[in-house]
């Protein structure tokens, strides 16, 4: 299982660190209020080590930067989950997309994988769609294809298992010449071009996108409704 979690945070970030550390004031309040039963809900995670890496405010920008910062902590032969912080999946069946993807990667004898999120036809021309080969492994991402030309209904969910080679590519590749950003998809494409193979799994559950105000509000409203039920 996962024993170490690395959060890549901004230079002025404190919220994530505070959330995952013990809050003495909150603990004292719960005890005074007779709500000791709530203490386990705010306790730090057990049997796992939390690490924080700071992404400099100056320098490169893009999705490969935090992956490159974490590369030194990945040993040769190791793989690690990489999940972007502005999205998650909610599964009412209490299943785990992470566990499902790890099982798929292991079953295929590979060291890397990614999750595709099934989307409705109306959204296919608005997003990047994953193309796979006959074995269900990654070929490429086609940006905003026409519905009739889309190779699948799976969009990239930015949920990965990456090996040391891809971490190093994320650390060393230059910025994308068209967009000027350091993009993780460039590292993935370079790995494929070198003969690497990446499994593609299909995500289950509701996809919650929190990278925009409307998406963040929708995710919070969904959680409130679940609490009511």
Q: What is each PLM-predicted segment?
A:
Residues 1-7:
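A short, N-terminal amphipathic alpha-helix
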Residues 2, 21, 75, 193:
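Short conserved AdoMet
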Residues 9-13:
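Residues in the short beta-alpha loop(s) of Rossmann-like NAD(P)-binding domains
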Residues 16, 26-29, 36-132, 171:
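Conserved beta-loop-beta/alpha segment of the NTase-like Rossmann-fold superfamily
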Residues 30-33, 181-182:
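A short, aromatic/hydrophobic, helix- or strand-capping loop or linear motif
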Residues 81, 95, 99-106, 137-229:
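Catalytic-core segments of class I nucleotidyltransferases/pyrophosphorylases
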């Amino acid at each position: 299982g996962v024993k170490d979690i690395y959060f890549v945070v901004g230079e002025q970030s404190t919220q994530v660190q505070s959330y995952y550390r013990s809050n003495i004031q909150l603990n004292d309040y719960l005890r005074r209020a007779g709500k000791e039963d709530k203490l386990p809900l705010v306790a730090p995670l057990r049997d796992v080590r939390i690490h924080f890496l700071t992404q400099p405010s100056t320098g490169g920008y893009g999705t490969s930067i935090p992956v490159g910062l974490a590369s030194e902590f990945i040993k040769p032969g190791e793989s690690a989950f990489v999940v972007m912080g502005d999205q998650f999946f909610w599964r009412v069946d209490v299943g785990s997309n992470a566990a499902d993807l790890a099982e798929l990667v292991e079953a295929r004898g590979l060291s890397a994988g990614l999750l595709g999120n099934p989307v409705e036809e109306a959204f296919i021309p608005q997003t990047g769609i994953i193309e796979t080969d006959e074995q269900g492994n990654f070929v490429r991402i086609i940006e905003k294809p026409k519905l009739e030309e889309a190779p699948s209904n799976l969009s990239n969910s930015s949920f990965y298992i990456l090996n040391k080679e891809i971490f190093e590519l994320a650390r060393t590749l230059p910025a994308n010449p068209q967009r000027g950003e350091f993009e993780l998809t460039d590292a993935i494409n370079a790995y494929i071009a070198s003969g690497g193979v990446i499994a593609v799994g299909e995500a289950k559950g509701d996809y919650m996108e929190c990278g925009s105000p409307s998406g963040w509000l929708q995710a919070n409203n969904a959680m409130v409704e679940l609490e009511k039920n």
